[in-house]
């Protein structure tokens, strides 16, 4: 029997199917070529491919969104406990300093200690429960304090600079006058230390006075270029180096000869080092490079002194080598 099956589709439906087969999906793009020879290869956009690679769900699409920023309970508890420990640390250090930490405790002391532990426990619970609130408050407070300290430091620095510039611009001789007044103040300290009114280490006053004078000059010369300030620091360290060498040589000689300096000797040492240090520093500021040229100057002076002695000795020897006949001829003339 012949199969008399006839399609129920109209010519218009068949034409629509042909158009649909040639249309391109705008979302998926054009269909790539399908190689049927490859094993296991499936045509793209097939139902099997959609099953193996399902589209992203709403949960996956929003996985990179906002997450819960709240800290875990254990971290909150640890930070709150650390803050309470830091708050109690000064009291514990004070009790340890007084040697009264858990020593000779009576009923009253133990009662107070138990009450304080109860208060700390309540504080721990409170801080853990309101963790976000008090941490934000602490951050805001720390930032505000840092800004206040910064503004105060800048204001004080500007005040010091304006004062120093005003003093320097008024008259340069004020630098010398203030430096001399500072020398008088330091000598007053020496006198008070000598008569016992002020207990200071007499052997170290010289360094303190020199550093103080250098800092004073540093403030007065603050408007000068940086190389001048650098030169001031260089001169200060050179002066302190000279003072250290003098002290080392003096102590070494005293130890070598088994001699000891009494109170008057310390005063003489401190006064001499103070005078030498301040003089060298001020001379270095007035004549830059004087300390660097000083070793060469001393070396040339010693060489010329020894050369003069050698010439004198050589001249005496030359006079002794004159023949006797020439001497008699000169005497006759």
From Swiss-Prot:
By its UniProt entry, which Pfam families does this protein fall under?
WTF
Q: Say if the entry is tagged with keyword Transmembrane.
A: yes
Compositional bias (Basic and acidic residues): 19-30
Question: What are the transmembrane regions?
Answer: 73-95, 108-130, 174-191, 204-226
GO CC terms, sorted: cytoplasm; vacuolar membrane
Q: Where does this protein come from, organism-wise?
A: Schizosaccharomyces pombe (strain 972 / ATCC 24843) (Fission yeast)
Q: Which family does it belong to?
A: Belongs to the WTF family.
- Residue numbers spanned by region Disordered: 1-69
Which protein is depicted?
Meiotic drive suppressor wtf9
Question: An example of a Gene Ontology BP annotation on this entry?
Answer: meiotic drive
Subunit comment for this entry?
A: Homomer. Interacts with other proteins that exhibit high sequence similarity.
Which key words are in the record? Membrane, Transmembrane, Transmembrane helix, Vacuole
What domain of life does the UniProt record list for this protein's source? Eukaryota
The record's subcellular location field reads: Spore membrane; Vacuole membrane
InterPro entries the UniProt entry points to: WTF
Q: Its function?
A: Acts as a suppressor component of the dual wtf meiotic drive system, and can suppress but not confer meiotic drive by compatible poisons. Wtf meiotic drive systems promote unequal transmission of alleles from the parental zygote to progeny spores by encoding a poison and an antidote from the same locus; the poison is trans-acting and forms toxic aggregates in all spores within an ascus, wherease the antidote is spore-specific and targets aggregates for degradation by the vacuole.
